[in-house]
């Protein structure tokens, strides 16, 4: 499967730096250390609730308003929240955004799957991933720049899903949770996604067996072999799926670090996001050429 993995990687737009185990493991370890620091400084944090009772429509409106400080103004569009038919709940994702027609991006739809347990903070961050400042926001923002129509034929899932994952991680800090609680949950989400992505590369590039995968997760204190077997079989059947989320996310984090160094005291989150959004979906090596001098 190695050749197929490389094809999936290149097609997603990751460039040549995809198999940077050290980079991904370093990100996981950094998130682990941040989690330890939060727990050390806030020993009672696990007793805090992550209850959020707003409706999906209210959450989306709240997110659209809250992102204005760090993200450029969104395109004026309509958003409809719909629910997956009961007969399809077993087969579809917890939530998903439908890409609008190329000639009418003002009408947008997000589907929520009530067959999945999307409660509290998970619903909030999922709507951020699919809506604001995630897929819906990125798609309509770029469409509003009047790009060459050929861009609609190109698919760079590393950029698209990397952006949505980055947006999801940012959304924890836009939620009603305390900052330490938001940080702990965000780091945990990042760690789990990172472990899956590293396993994805290990299985399909290095040929990890189930035993190798069990050992990988055990290194980080995850030792339920039945759960790991399910993860292993899922990854085995869908090569490179987790990479478009995690590697795309880490590429954006690394790009942001370099952009901050370049801008120095003039760094602006809103300007960084604006430049990244205006380049639009592309291989990260191309994105860098436009953003890093």
Question: What do these predicted ranges mean?
Answer:
Residues 1-293:
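N-terminal maturation segment of proteins
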């Amino acid at each position: 499967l190695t050749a197929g993995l490389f094809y999936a990687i290149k097609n997603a737009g990751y460039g040549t730096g995809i198999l940077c185990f050290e980079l991904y493991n370093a990100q996981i370890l950094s998130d682990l250390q941040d989690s330890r620091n939060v727990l050390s400084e806030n020993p009672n944090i696990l007793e805090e609730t992550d209850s959020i009772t707003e409706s999906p429509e209210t959450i989306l409106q709240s997110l659209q308003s809250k992102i204005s400080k760090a993200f450029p103004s969104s395109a004026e569009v309509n958003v409809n929240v719909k629910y997956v038919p009961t007969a399809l709940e077993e087969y579809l994702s917890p939530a998903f955004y439908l890409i609008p027609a190329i000639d009418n991006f003002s009408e947008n739809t997000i589907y929520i799957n009530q067959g999945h347990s999307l409660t509290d903070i998970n619903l909030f961050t999922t709507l951020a991933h699919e809506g604001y400042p995630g897929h819906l926001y990125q798609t309509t923002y770029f469409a509003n720049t009047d790009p060459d129509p050929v861009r609609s034929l190109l698919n760079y899932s590393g950029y698209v899903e990397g952006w949505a994952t980055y947006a999801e991680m940012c959304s924890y800090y836009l939620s009603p949770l305390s900052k330490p609680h938001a940080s702990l949950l965000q780091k945990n989400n990042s760690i789990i996604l990172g472990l899956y992505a590293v396993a994805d590369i290990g299985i399909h590039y290095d040929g990890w067996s189930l035993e190798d995968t069990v050992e990988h997760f055990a290194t980080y204190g995850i030792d339920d072999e039945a759960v790991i077997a399910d993860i292993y079989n899922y990854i085995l059947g869908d090569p490179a799926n987790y990479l478009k989320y995690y590697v795309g996310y880490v590429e954006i984090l690394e790009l942001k670090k370099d952009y901050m160094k370049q801008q120095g005291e003039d760094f602006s989150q809103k300007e960084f996001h604006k430049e990244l959004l205006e380049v639009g979906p592309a291989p990260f090596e191309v994105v860098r050429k436009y953003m890093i001098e």
